[in-house]
Amino acid sequence: MDIRHANSARDAEAIAAIYAPFVTNGPVSFEDVAPTAAEMAGRIERLTETHAWLVAEDGDEILGYAYGCPHRERAAYQWATEVSVYVDPRHHRRGAGRALYEALFPRLEERGYRLALAGIALPNDASVGLHEACGFEPVGVYRRIGFKHGKWWDVGWWQLELPASQSSSSSNASVGQASTARRASPIRSGGTSDSSMIG
């Protein structure tokens, strides 16, 4: 299994296919209409510019993906990022979710983000277990905040201080000043050298 940066043209269709059941079959996503491959490609392109979007791949098959996105629009929130990970149910329990997060967090740190937040529609023991295994701590619950499939759902929030922020002094620099060149740094994974590989 390799972790690499997502390519909007190459990966959008597979990513949209993985995501669609999470939209249509339950409360994991609060979207009510699954995005098309073209819409997903646009999301990948936008978030690659400001955050990071990674995929886990085995051969030519996408197992899952993870990304960071803005937490809130107002300026004081700019050092926080929401993170999400989705793994094809056929490939659960292979470690893809954790591997994706372990590769994602350093990329977000490089871009200046100091805090990762994850919102989880409850109950979801598997997602809670993954996030807590990755070091996230629960910080609160929004009660009955989402209505989907005929019922109200709670959303729990977990947060993780990104390691670089714990040892560095506070900076007033905008996260937008981080170099976009970092996302293309060559790293090896699974014995394969590629400018898009992470590991």
What residue ranges belong to the model's regions?
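A short beta-loop-alpha structural element at the N-terminal edge
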Residues: 2-15
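Conserved beta-strand-loop-alpha-helix junction that forms the acyl-donor binding cleft
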Residues: 92, 118-128
